[in-house]
Amino acid sequence: MKTFIPFCMILMAFGWQPTAQAAGTPEYMAVLAVMGYGYTVKVSINGADAGVKGGKSENRRLFNQDHEMAKQALPAIRAQNFVLKPGENRIAVEYTKTDPKSSDTLEVKLELEGYPEPVFLLQSKAKSSGKIEKQFVLQKPAPKDFKSIVVNE
């Protein structure tokens, strides 16, 4: 550690700036998993469309907004995948069954690295359409009293 501080000072003299993670901001990585057979689905995280369409199984890897990889990502990827932030976040899910008589089950799950259970879990079989909006808090480490947001429709 004694060598790291002077080395950082030398790098900063040449214009290097520490990343958000190096400066102490936690790094968040999550997986958004959607089993949307028989449904059209739209998922937004903090107002950003995650690019989920439904009709199949889809997964998205999500990161915090100031993740160091965000700088290298194409703007469209950055807008869909680098959407998480420390503290309060919002997830919105809109869905419609493509065939109201279908017995397909929709499942939308947001799993955060280091958390014991999904942060958010939606399961719907009975409703032909719906819109759910929930808020969740991200912090590292996961709170001891963490409870998953579970919606069954």
Placement of each model-derived feature along the sequence:
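Beta-strand-rich recognition domains
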Residues: 18-58, 74-153
